[in-house]
């Protein structure tokens, strides 16, 4: 880790989610040299209670005149370096709700020595003070925002240091190869010949390990961000019924009137650890209704950003020119699944009303949103699309920042292979090798500037 100037000011922020009328407990976190003294100045603690480290005290936060209580609280005292940030930390736990927690924070921030914390600043101080690695801090943020158990599991693995250990091991192997090469450049006459074949083989092996991490990151992205599935089709083909069936909730209004859905509705389920968000869109058709037109416009924007589009048609009535027109309007770069709904209403003529080129499609599922018949086929398709079976055994998954740096590292290693092939001098070998080492150092936080750290932690939530 680079050496940055120590933090001198004291910071404070609400450390828990706060909503009106929700949550029985809230916490305010204070970190810095004046954290304990500030807390003593706003809290009345009855009896003889010890403010020594790792103690819990009971008391009341008072108004500035010390005559009125703001709230009844518990005070957790953690003196540095044995705290989350490595500094003196005090957490004040009060009753939940907006008013008490805001009044206590305002009371704390009234002291000149304390300022409001920036997003992620507590975690940033923990990294700067050596309490956490950068990847551990990022994993804490991932845990807070986890939308499934698998995502939380991956985040915990990162907090335990799995990402840091893995990347550091790869970086160490690269440093060993760089050391061998540079030693031959500086002291060629005093050392045995460089085993060029061994160096090349080791670079290939390292690149293979990195590519596995990159593949894992792609699989992990489904676990983290989930799959966005847009339900498209003409009005009254059962889009809303299908979403209600899949989500097990009455999210959308279901009627026999075409054009009932005029806005974008969403519902989320978790399939084997992967969040899947279904987006029920307004039916695509020509209409003079102004409100419905707005809904259709939003539908087209939603389709562009979906991971998968499910085009639904009425299987009992057959494939129509309107269905064909909608198919041609869909983005060609988004994966498509065609679903024939209302199979419970089909008759002998239904099959003949669907073109053979539609029936032959591998991405075709026939079902009934009303009865649930065929629902398993749709779920299995989604699981296959997510690659959920591949998430079993997935221990670590890089986030977007880490993934970009891992890709840059492999590009540098690929450049080294070109240098090998062109039989260039050893000096050329070291250029990309050193760059690859720097990329991995940036990934783990061992080779970072303060500006880069500020940028990374600005994406964290306040209070973390």
Curated annotation (Swiss-Prot):
Q: Where does (6S)-5-formyl-5,6,7,8-tetrahydrofolate bind?
A: 29, 91, 131, 464
So where does Mg(2+) get bound? 240, 261
List each copy of the TrmE-type G domain by range. 226-387
Per the UniProt record, the lineage of the source organism begins with:
Bacteria, Bacillati, Cyanobacteriota, Cyanophyceae, Synechococcales
Q: Which HAMAP family match?
A: GTPase_MnmE
Q: Which PROSITE patterns match?
A: G_TRME
Q: Which Gene Ontology molecular function entries are recorded, alphabetically?
A: GTP binding; GTPase activity; metal ion binding
An individual GO BP term: tRNA methylation
What's a GO cellular component annotated to this UniProt protein? Answer: cytosol
Q: Which CDD domains match?
A: trmE, TrmE_N
Which residues are noted in the entry as GTP-binding?
Answer: 236-241, 255-261, 280-283
Q: Where in the cell is it found?
A: Cytoplasm
Annotated K(+) binding lies at: 236, 255, 257, 260
Q: For this protein, what is the EC number? A: 3.6.-.-
At the top of the EC hierarchy, this enzyme's class is: hydrolase
Q: Which InterPro entries match?
A: G_TrmE, GTP-bd, GTP-bd_TrmE_N, GTPase_MnmE, MnmE_dom2, MnmE_helical, P-loop_NTPase, Small_GTP-bd
**Listed cofactors:** K(+)
Annotated cofactor note: Binds 1 potassium ion per subunit.
Q: Which protein family is it in? A: Belongs to the TRAFAC class TrmE-Era-EngA-EngB-Septin-like GTPase superfamily. TrmE GTPase family.
> What task does this protein carry out?
Exhibits a very high intrinsic GTPase hydrolysis rate. Involved in the addition of a carboxymethylaminomethyl (cmnm) group at the wobble position (U34) of certain tRNAs, forming tRNA-cmnm(5)s(2)U34.
What is its quaternary makeup?
Homodimer. Heterotetramer of two MnmE and two MnmG subunits.
Q: Which domain of life is it from?
A: Bacteria
Key words of the record? Cytoplasm, GTP-binding, Hydrolase, Magnesium, Metal-binding, Nucleotide-binding, Potassium, tRNA processing
Q: What is the name of this protein?
A: tRNA modification GTPase MnmE
